[in-house]
């Protein structure tokens, strides 16, 4: 089953709309303290750029062969060009809107000896205006008939307002297009009526203002009912995942070693949505996403999953189940 599904990934078209970011890493060694101030001097050995935020969701989809439309806001600056040029060839960037009044979001990290010493952020707080919203919606309308799914990747940077999110969700519903969301708890009411959301356990509890002692299944069902969702997939770290569909499906974790959880949520929503769009049931899609999540947490930094890794890992977990 998994091989046939993954073979179909190359036929799937997905639009990702969300907070695009560029992650910059400056790697080096610390051998002395600066004479100018009591701070370490980092001798730089490597500098690299990695797709972050919603751009990492896109990168995960592209790595598995999907055809991806990228939607979001960037500045009219050099970092926007770096971000756009970093996308794989199977990513269409025509839905990206370049604006004058804010910079492309960049997170620069200085790392020495596997230790993060400093992070510098280039971003400004904003909410998308009506004109920008209308452009994004009109661009999406031009492609909606050919799409299998839309992912809304919310990092609470001001793009996915309630107005824009509801217009996107309604457009998807009218055209029988799956729409999934990785939401921040404070914005979850923006996404009423989506096909599915993929919060982690902490986010799920915060979204319904549940006490820590409340049963996770009650929380999951509350989320589904309150926000009129078809399904909810709650990621639970070492406890695995729980899918709230017509039934409750507990999916145990399998990750052998956890090195870095950076971007794991991006991988989960990417694979969950892609598998569903390719013909899996929600439960099958959750199991495939679980396998993918287990792979990326075993890698250092923001990572993607290959088709080969996903097939092998899925078969190792589920072939005897």
Question: Residue spans of the language-model regions?
Answer:
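Conserved phosphate-binding/catalytic loop of the ribokinase/pfkB sugar-kinase fold
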Residues: 95-102, 109-144
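Substrate-binding N-lobe of the ribokinase-like
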Residues: 2-5, 35, 39-105, 312-313
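Conserved phosphate/ATP/ADP-binding segment of small-molecule kinases
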Residues: 159-249
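Structural motif
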Residues: 15-17, 119, 148-151, 180, ...
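Active-site metal-binding loops of divalent metal-dependent hydrolases
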Residues: 20, 155, 267
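Short acidic, glycine-rich surface-loop motifs adjacent to enzyme active sites
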Residues: 146-159
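Positively charged, low-complexity intrinsically disordered leader regions
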Residues: 1-31
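Conserved post-catalytic alpha-helical subdomain immediately downstream of the catalytic base
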Residues: 230-231, 254-317
